């Protein structure tokens, strides 16, 4: 099993969700437990090179990789949710999308102050979600020490804005 096999399993859907977008559909990977285990193992290899306390991942596809990785490494997992989805007191962060604004939230006490945080997500493009997560973590008095992604859309992100050690498996 290798990265090329993983890349060849990801479906590219042209003009979805709108014209000019090449959507990377990871659903075919979810159908193959061996490939998913390989991905989690590769993310774990990277994560083991970092001293961190907590894994966070954004809704919803980030959960598919963040939680299994946290279980694999016996670390806490904290979900980053869309606005209005968490029942307890939250910290919010608004950020820009290409078509407007969005807000993400985390439950206030789930990331203790001075925690070292690892961000996991399925894909990084412009980095907008990642920077918003970094801002949330900072508001809670903690630090992002690393981030890892299954897919990186190369050249779209301002990498200078990203905090900590960076890893991506598949590049387009």
From Swiss-Prot:
Pfam families linked to this entry: Pribosyltran
Instruction: List the catalysed reactions.
Output: AMP + diphosphate = 5-phospho-alpha-D-ribose 1-diphosphate + adenine
Which pathway, metabolic or otherwise, does it act in? Purine metabolism; AMP biosynthesis via salvage pathway; AMP from adenine: step 1/1
Q: Give the encoding gene's name.
A: apt
Q: What is its EC number?
A: 2.4.2.7
Instruction: Tell me the protein family, please.
Output: Belongs to the purine/pyrimidine phosphoribosyltransferase family.
| Organism per entry | Malacoplasma penetrans (strain HF-2)
Main localization (coarse):
cytoplasm
Q: Which UniProt key words apply to this protein?
A: Cytoplasm, Glycosyltransferase, Purine salvage, Transferase
What EC class is this? Answer: transferase
**GO cellular component labels:** cytoplasm
Q: Which function does this protein serve?
A: Catalyzes a salvage reaction resulting in the formation of AMP, that is energically less costly than de novo synthesis.
Q: Note the InterPro entries from the entry.
A: Ade_phspho_trans, PRibTrfase_dom, PRTase-like, UPRTase/APRTase
Spell out the subunit comment: Homodimer.
The name on file for this protein is Adenine phosphoribosyltransferase
What terms describe the molecular function in GO for this protein? adenine binding; adenine phosphoribosyltransferase activity; AMP binding
Cross-referenced PROSITE patterns: PUR_PYR_PR_TRANSFER (PS00103)
Gene Ontology annotations of biological process type? adenine salvage; AMP salvage; purine ribonucleoside salvage
Quote the subcellular location field of this record: Cytoplasm
